[in-house]
């Protein structure tokens, strides 16, 4: 049994915390609104007051002098709040998994982490996360790539009218995703393009036409995979992003209203779909597709994101030396670890089609 501290128990965080508790681990949950895990056996709740630092609360509530153990910290607080926690954790000799997906990536704390003996694995969701792992496998097989593309989205299973969308994560983070310029690779160099550009129609099996547009999701891949052209596109039902653009350009976009209008509704069927493609210079091409419609244990995007993180946690607990001190992106994980993560997700009912899905 390990002692694991979960910062943030929202849709994704609660999934991870519950899975860890069900596996017999001692889980400490830190959140200002921990309602999703109240009453769950094996989870001790630490209520965060507004503005409180979860790292300080963790050390205060479980002092080291009293035999306090930190086997692993899982930071699932969103955006800048989560980034501040990971930066603080980089100054302590603990293992951390970072799922904050902040604009300010934790690789900037690599030197600090090495100095203090901290090991941080970041962005281990579905995309970024599993997408990085798959592209790293393509790079290991092909060498430098000619082209790489990721298309991913969590959406209602069919158009619902209006926005045709509900946010599986914080709507504020989705708005940030739609406004932050997209960093991509063109002619082997990093360039910045306007968010939501390169809008195009794609066909998603069993769903029909959907719309893809550039977003800033490559992150660590910008510096880790040698490639001529690389892009990440978010996928939505047609009309959704044009409605956002029209309201934004006309000055009537109200972020407070969006948070209400995009609120997740557990009664609405939804699915997550991802396609990862890599092309070699000799013409070889590999494609993976990932699809999930959720299950009794959670909605699809939260489940997929949480499953990748959960699998990484299990791997790291079984091999404490899996990663040395420093800050590590998901593509730095060994092939055998990636293979086991894929198989664990398959065992959980996530559909993954492509190479490495039957390796032991």
Q: Residue ranges of each PLM-predicted region?
A:
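NAD(P)-binding Rossmann-fold cofactor-contacting core
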Residues: 27-39
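N-terminal Rossmann-like NAD(P) cofactor-binding module of classical short-chain dehydrogenase/reductase
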Residues: 71-76, 96-98
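C-terminal catalytic/substrate-binding lobe primarily of soluble NAD(P)-dependent oxidoreductases
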Residues: 141-360
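Beta-loop-alpha module in the N-terminal Rossmann-like domain of NAD(P)-dependent dehydrogenases
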Residues: 73-88, 103-105
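Hydrophobic/small residue at the entry helix of a nucleotide-binding pocket
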Residues: 12
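Aromatic pocket-lining residues of Rossmann-like dinucleotide-binding sites
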Residues: 20, 89
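Conserved N-terminal Rossmann-fold NAD(P)-binding element of oxidoreductases
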Residues: 4-8
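Rossmann-fold NAD(P)-binding glycine/threonine-rich loop
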Residues: 99-120
């Amino acid at each position: 049994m390990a002692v694991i501290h979960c910062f943030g128990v929202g849709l994704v965080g609660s999934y991870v915390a519950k899975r860890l508790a069900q596996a017999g681990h001692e889980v400490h949950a830190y959140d200002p609104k921990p309602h999703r895990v109240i009453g769950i056996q094996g989870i001790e709740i630490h209520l965060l007051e507004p503005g409180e630092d979860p790292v300080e609360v963790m050390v205060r509530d479980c002092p080291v002098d009293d035999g306090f153990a930190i086997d692993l910290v899982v930071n699932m607080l969103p955006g800048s709040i989560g980034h501040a926690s990971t930066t603080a954790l980089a100054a302590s000799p603990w293992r951390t998994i970072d799922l904050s997906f902040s604009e300010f990536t934790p690789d900037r704390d690599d030197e600090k982490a090495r100095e203090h003996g901290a090991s941080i694995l970041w962005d281990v969701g579905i995309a970024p996360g599993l997408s990085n792992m798959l592209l790293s496998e393509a790079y290991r097989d092909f060498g430098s790539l000619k082209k790489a593309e990721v298309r991913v989205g969590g959406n209602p299973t069919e158009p619902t009218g209006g926005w045709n969308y509900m946010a599986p994560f914080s709507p504020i983070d989705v708005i940030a995703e739609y406004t932050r310029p997209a960093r991509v690779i063109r002619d082997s160099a990093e360039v910045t393009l306007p968010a939501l550009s390169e809008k195009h129609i794609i066909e998603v099996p069993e769903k029909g036409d959907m719309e893809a547009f550039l977003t800033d999701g490559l992150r660590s891949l910008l510096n880790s995979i040698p490639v001529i052209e690389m892009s990440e596109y978010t996928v939505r039902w047609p009309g959704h992003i044009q409605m956002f653009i029209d309201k934004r350009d006309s000055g009537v976009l109200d972020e407070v209203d969006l948070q209400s209008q995009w609120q997740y509704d557990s009664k609405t069927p939804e699915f997550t779909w991802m396609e990862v493609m890599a092309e070699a210079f000799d013409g070889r091409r590999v494609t993976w597709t990932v699809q999930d419609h959720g299950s009794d244990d959670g909605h699809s995007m939260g489940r997929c994101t949480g499953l990748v993180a959960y699998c990484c946690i299990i791997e790291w607990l079984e091999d404490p030396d899996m990663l040395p001190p420093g800050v590590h992106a998901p593509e730095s994980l060994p092939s055998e670890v990636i293979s086991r993560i894929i198989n664990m997700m398959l065992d959980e009912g996530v559909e993954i089609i492509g190479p490495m899905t039957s390796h032991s």
